[in-house]
Amino acid sequence: MIKNQVEMFAYAKINLALAITGRRPDGYHELESVMQSIGIYDRIRVTLAEGGIQCSCGEWSGPENLAYRAAEAFLSGLGSSQGIHIDIEKNIPVQAGLGGGSADAAAALQALNKLFKEPYTEEELKSFAAQLGADVAFCLKGGTQWATGVGEELKGLPHAPKINLVLIKPDQGVNTAEAYRAFDQEGKFSHLDYAGWQEALASGRAESLIPLLYNDLEPASMKLLPEIAWVKEELMKQNGCLGALMSGSGSAVFGIVQTEEQAEKIAAIWRERNYHVWVTHTMERGNIYG
């Protein structure tokens, strides 16, 4: 019997650090980032079917969804007209800086490659990923990675220790393009300390990462949505929170917390304030098959 459906768990990411290092002639920004998989995931089911590509993801259904575009690119490369149905159970919030759309696209590529008996190598899948978006290549690989270029060039780092996290997201999101435009007005290019990150991660202690947390987009996104600054400031005051940072272009802020019990207590405070809150942790790998 031919397997006609593959299920994937598509994991979100946070940026433990993000520096904008320059801007290319085509307008894209070059960066250095320490990217990290976390335990919040979307559930993706990809099924061989009839009638072209269909992508079901609530209000994010249809051809604009990155998973749909991933399927288009995959099939086009094979010269195939096979019908594909993609069903996405969405748990990763959008416009949060957590790479939800990218995780879904990466999972769609991985699921399709399995369904079609692996016609593409890992390098070829990475090539598709680079065409789809800056974070898709990371989501194919997952874990803890040093990203450069526009985010598509990856180099492994020591696995982060298991870190307890609280994620808090305001109702309003931040548009990534708007965040970069705001950065262009006032931001300055910078670089991260690769050797410092290697050493901190290799120590196996969450506390070692705190001095290195950094995000060049944070001031820009805080200007667009000042609530982010308030969330970060309040989170830092709470018992057990070692450090906090906005992820990516926001609007989600993560707090690194000493224990899971403390993370749950902090989360309860923010739920009472009617915020979107998740208690999670770092992951050693990214997307996995269901």
Swiss-Prot record:
Coiled coil: none annotated. Its EC number is 2.7.1.148. Gene3D superfamilies: 3.30.230.10, GHMP kinase, C-terminal domain (3.30.70.890). GO terms for molecular function: 4-(cytidine 5'-diphospho)-2-C-methyl-D-erythritol kinase activity; ATP binding. It catalyses: 4-CDP-2-C-methyl-D-erythritol + ATP = 4-CDP-2-C-methyl-D-erythritol 2-phosphate + ADP + H(+). InterPro entries: GHMP_kinase_C_dom, GHMP_kinase_C_sf, GHMP_kinase_N_dom, IspE, Ribosomal_Su5_D2-typ_SF, Ribsml_uS5_D2-typ_fold_subgr. It comes from the Bacteria. Pfam families: GHMP_kinases_C (PF08544), GHMP_kinases_N (PF00288). The active site is at residues 13, 135. The keyword Transferase applies. The keyword Cell membrane does not apply. ATP binds at residues 93-103. Keywords: ATP-binding, Isoprene biosynthesis, Kinase, Nucleotide-binding, Transferase. One of its GO terms (biological process) is terpenoid biosynthetic process. Pathway: Isoprenoid biosynthesis; isopentenyl diphosphate biosynthesis via DXP pathway; isopentenyl diphosphate from 1-deoxy-D-xylulose 5-phosphate: step 3/6. Catalyzes the phosphorylation of the position 2 hydroxy group of 4-diphosphocytidyl-2C-methyl-D-erythritol. PANTHER family: 4-DIPHOSPHOCYTIDYL-2-C-METHYL-D-ERYTHRITOL KINASE, CHLOROPLASTIC. Belongs to the GHMP kinase family. IspE subfamily. This is 4-diphosphocytidyl-2-C-methyl-D-erythritol kinase.
